[in-house]
Amino acid sequence: MKKDNFPPAKKVPEKYKPLPLVPEYILLPLWLVSLGAPNLIYSGILFADTLHILKWTAAGVPAAIALLIAGWRVMRYGSERVRVRLDLFALIWLAILVYCLLMPLWVNIMSPTAWCLEMVCFATVWVFYVLSASSFPEWGLRPVLLIGSINASVNVLFAELQIRGLNNFSFLDGTMFADFRRFSNIILPTPGNYIGNTAQQNMFGLWVAVAVLGGVYLYAYDAWRHDPSEHGRKAILPAVFVSLSVIILKYAVTLSSVLLGIAAALLLAAALVTGRRNIFSVSVLIMTAVNFWGLMNSTSRSATIALTLGLLVMLSVTLWKFARSYAIRFTAVLMVILCVFWASLYSPRSEQIVDKTADIIRNAENIGNRRGIWATSYAMFLEHPEGVGIGQYKWHYLEGQREGFRRFNAPLWYRWQYTHWAHNEFLQFFCEGGVIGGMLLLLMWVVWLIPALRGLIRGRHSITAGGNSEPDTNWVWAVSLVTLITFCAVFTRPFHRIENMVWLALAFALSNREFFPERLSFSILKSPSARKLTGAFCIVSSIAGCIYISSGIYGNYVLRQALSTNNEHLQLHYLNEAEKHPIVREDTMRNIGWHYMQAGEQRNNPEMLLRGFNILWSQFQREPHSEDISRLLNFAQRYQIEPALREIASYFRPGEYHLKRIPQRDASGRTVRALLLLNGPGSDDK
């Protein structure tokens, strides 16, 4: 048969080749920092915000740098070489962002500081998604998950030291390593807690759950890519060795430290038996075991159930889409996880695990003490269907709780409490974004879910057992992680930690890149003027974001200096300097109020006292917080500031307190009928 003679393809000149928004060799290191660093670092005592400011910096600045590069490349090369496309998912996300940006036009924003910070974080995560969808390399997931596993394992080590009160490295006293105690400040100083450097139990549980899911994926889908005809059998052996090591380590606590050496020998044997190049797979198994141990000892029910769902999704996809050998790999790593689960039942925190599990069964209607919080959130939504503004939930909580007591007649289960979060991210977004914002958020999830389900059902990517080609499987991890974090979002607050949101954004990007129809992606920047304008906007936004976070870092540092000095004039100087920086402005104003009140009490100066109270009361009306109630209440009773006293009293649960006029002598010796807040039921006096 005559062959067709086609002309040889012309080689595309280098200057006309298509370019990514950000080069892979630049994007991946930036993403490794943004994804790997925030959960391991904290601000420390040099800053007023001892936790978040450096986490925000580590997560956001790499995205800002990548945005700067993307803007420059768009301006320089144009749409001919740099293809800029936004899928429908990104456009809906952008619509939410724009809607929240415009909300101050019709909503009274109580705290501009919180609104601005939330908007910056929200925009940063959107940028992270767009750049990941367009430029993140498929091969980049392996180092990302490896960095995440290492980070989580170190956090588990930190948590083990914290729970034992050894986070100050006191066990090094009297040894040759005693000088290393000065490095103990790398661990969050929270002895008696099991939270690592995440600073919160559920967030620690979520982070190690994300790492466990990544470890399972690395072992089942990535570590055994070579020699697929045998990888099912080979994957079992190291899992058996690591499982035996877990069992031996469990008994080593009570039997003999000699067994620790046996366990180490088994781990070494696992590495030797599987070959030098497969030491990576053994390391992944060990870190996965450590991270699952941390998850169980965190006693976080939401994170544990979320991981279970994520693993079920991954297992279902594995059985439905891929060859039997993948299921064997998956089963091997699950064997290690089950051994760690068994060992955790004999750990010192096992009683808490059992008690919290039993509580959720006995008191299912209480939903882990969330029933009252959700009732308050529902009342807030009914009171403000247009939304209260992004980042404003916590400043409307006391008002929402007061409205909830009125609407629901304060049943016994509805106790007074205060929290910053709804412990349900979707409910909280309905409160903050209103009906429109909440529906857009749900639409975003639906737009992700439909193409993903369609792609899974159609049987794409299936291969035959013993095939010599390995499909791209990053989407398996992505779909599983979205499931995990979405479940956590129903009971906790992962959306309000940017260090979690960047992981969710990456998962969305990899999933949508695989399943989203091409017809639902839109090319933009076709005209030169739009290209230049957009590129310039990206550059300016990047620089502005870096300036904003730099200002916050310096403001936090200055505010810490103010709180650390006993010199009245120097403290006021530092406070006035810190007030210039937006991120800390509201906190600084509150501290200025306390400064004047303390100075007024020391000098017995009523004018300074009143000035301080007025500042604090103004701040309280913008940002009502439970920490301020008692001190403001005492001052209002002491100086009989009745409007403030009645407003504070209105926030308490009906029937537990009442206002009553009681005869008292004032400073001049006269008898007056002072209005006081008393315990117990009763009607309020006029």
Language model: regions and residue ranges:
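A juxtamembrane structural motif centered on a specific transmembrane helix
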Residues: 2-21, 458-473, 507-553, 682-684
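Hydrophobic alpha-helical transmembrane segments in integral membrane proteins
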Residues: 345-361, 530-570
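C-terminal luminal/periplasmic domains and tails of membrane-associated envelope-modifying transferases
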Residues: 561-686
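Transmembrane alpha-helix boundary signature
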Residues: 69-83, 101-113
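Short, hydrophobic transmembrane alpha-helix segments
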Residues: 40-54, 75-80, 249-253
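A conserved mid-to-late transmembrane alpha helix and its immediate loop/hinge
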Residues: 200, 385, 410-450
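Alpha-helical transmembrane segments of multi-pass inner-membrane proteins
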Residues: 2, 18-41, 57-71, 97, ...
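Interfacial juxtamembrane loops and adjacent helix segments
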Residues: 167-195, 354-368, 375, 379, ...
